[in-house]
Amino acid sequence: MAISFDKAFGIHQYALSVRSKRAEVLSSNIANADTPGFKARDINFSQALEEAQHQQGFGLATTSEKHFALQSDAPGLTQYRNPLQPDTGDGNTVDVQQERSEFLRNSLEYQTSLEFMNSKISGLLKALKGEQ
């Protein structure tokens, strides 16, 4: 009997990749907080998760990895954020407090998905070894 990793891991395998990409975008925002004209960006998580599932052929069997074009970047899913602070005069829309808060939240959610996947892998290993 074959093990279906899509069923075992659910959406958490896709959530990890989306949260990783979001961490890159948020850290770029923080790094460019003092760059004149820089516009803060973010990723719509639910839309990106749906796209990641689609790109990975969620639930579909493939005979060749050439059948699906996998992309590590998320073009079209990265959106400019509407600034919540007044214009500082340099055109930069990064609110460092908001970016740090979003980065922390994203990190906690990444860690939660990672812990869930670790517990699933541990369960699969126990099943393969015949342990309880």
Swiss-Prot record:
GO terms for biological process: bacterial-type flagellum-dependent swarming motility. The keyword Cell cycle does not apply. It comes from the Bacteria. The keyword Signal does not apply. GO terms for cellular component: bacterial-type flagellum basal body, rod. Keywords: Bacterial flagellum. Transmembrane segments: none annotated. It is found in: Bacterial flagellum basal body. PANTHER family: FLAGELLAR BASAL BODY ROD PROTEIN FLGB, FLAGELLAR PROTEIN. Belongs to the flagella basal body rod proteins family. Structural component of flagellum, the bacterial motility apparatus. Part of the rod structure of flagellar basal body. The basal body constitutes a major portion of the flagellar organelle and consists of a number of rings mounted on a central rod. In Gram-negative bacteria, at least four rings, L, P, S and M are present, whereas Gram-positive bacteria lack the L and P rings. The rod consists of about 26 subunits of FlgG in the distal portion, and FlgB, FlgC and FlgF build up the proximal portion of the rod with about 6 subunits each. This is Flagellar basal body rod protein FlgB. It comes from Aeromonas hydrophila. The gene is flgB.
